């Protein structure tokens, strides 16, 4: 099993190279247990667009960015909270710092992804605000 460290450089390379629908299924359905309908709202796409893709097809760039942001935040949250279950729970729970939306919902844009990573950094270093 290859372990990927989701750094900004590796994430950028991954986005440029493309993310397959297979990875989408592993992340969205396998790790986060999010429905296609809910993910489509988060990613700003349609369920129909997602359904048309075969496992080896590449996701549209914006959708791939959301998947990569999910994995990057998940990796950091797992390091901080010590387990994948706690990571997913935190990422899917409403967060007052994010205006009451969950970190997963905030990951629909680069700005939201930066904000989520910033919050995780503050938690990691014990800076609560």
Predicted regions and their residues:
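Non-transmembrane "mature" sequence context
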Residues: 1-129
């Amino acid at each position: 099993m290859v372990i990927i460290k989701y750094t900004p450089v590796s994430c950028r390379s991954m986005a440029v190279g493309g993310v397959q629908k297979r990875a989408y299924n592993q992340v969205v359905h396998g790790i986060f247990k999010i429905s296609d309908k809910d993910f489509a709202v988060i990613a700003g796409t349609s369920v129909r667009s997602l359904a048309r893709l075969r496992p080896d097809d590449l996701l549209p760039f914006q959708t791939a960015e959301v998947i990569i942001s999910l994995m990057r935040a998940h990796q950091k949250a797992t390091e901080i909270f010590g387990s994948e279950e706690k990571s997913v729970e935190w990422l899917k729970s409403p967060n007052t710092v994010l205006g009451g939306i969950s970190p997963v919902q905030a990951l629909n844009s680069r700005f939201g992804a930066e904000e989520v990573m910033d919050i995780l950094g503050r938690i990691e270093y014990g800076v609560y605000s």
